[in-house]
Design a protein with these regions (language model features):
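Terminal intrinsically disordered, low-complexity extensions flanking WD-repeat/beta-propeller proteins
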Residues: 64-72, 81-83, 90-95, 100-191
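Short loop/turn segments that connect beta-strands within beta-propeller blades
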Residues: 10-13, 53-55, 99-102, 140
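Loop/turn segments within WD40 beta-propeller blades
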Residues: 31-37, 42, 75-82, 88, ...
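Solenoidal tandem-repeat scaffolds enriched in leucines and small polar residues
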Residues: 1-19
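Conserved strand-to-loop turn within each blade of WD40 beta-propeller repeats
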Residues: 1-2, 42-45, 87-91, 128-131
């Protein structure tokens, strides 16, 4: 793990920019914001940094999860048009932040041991953990979730770093009873 991000031009293979934070924390994973202008970096100092890679500056820093020894990664999502950042934590939780004000809006008990990864698609969130399970979460209000387009909502919100003023509530997302055990012999790859 290195303490910098490199932005590459995939058509030429050229490094366009190297981004380094003054604290130099090792970076474990990154993801693009859906609008393509920002990069969210997960680092071993228990912080997420939202980089504007064009200007080379950190626009926001999010703290409130634990990440000091594992490569973990999360994503952007949207509920009822409200964009958020979802990140796993070494204490097994999933932490959700309001993109604009950087506040933790929800903590979800996810896994026994480290939660390694979180991803969101429309009104569904999945997580994978050290306990060998993939957990699936679904927005509890299907009518409100109808037509959610996380890409469009986050794209629109991150364009000028704005989100709606409605906070996420703990009852907005509930755990569905779906725990999928992971075993190496469950995964078959065909050549």
């Amino acid at each position: 793990m290195e303490p910098w991000l490199r932005i590459w031009d995939t058509s030429t293979g050229q490094c366009l920019r190297t981004l380094v934070h003054e604290d130099n924390p090792p970076i474990t994973s990154v993801c693009f914001a859906p609008n393509g202008r920002y990069v969210l970096a997960f680092s071993l100092d228990s912080c997420l940094r939202l980089w504007d890679y064009v200007s080379g500056t950190v626009k926001k820093t999010y703290s409130g999860h634990k990440n000091q020894g594992f490569s973990i990664g999360g994503c952007f999502g949207s509920v009822d048009g409200e964009p958020f950042i979802a990140a796993p934590s070494e204490d097994g939780e999933i932490v959700l932040w309001d993109v604009k004000n950087k506040e933790v809006v929800q903590r979800i008990s996810g896994h026994q041991g480290v939660c390694f990864w979180v991803d969101v698609y429309e009104d569904i969130m999945v997580s994978a953990g050290q306990d060998g399970k993939i957990r699936v979460y679904k927005h509890h209000n299907p009518e409100a979730a109808k037509g959610i387009n996380g890409v469009a909502a986050v794209n629109e919100a991150l364009g000028d770093l704005m989100v709606t003023d409605l906070p996420l509530k703990s009852e907005d997302i509930k755990k569905e009873i779906i725990d999928l055990p992971l075993k190496s012999n469950d995964i078959k790859i065909e050549a």
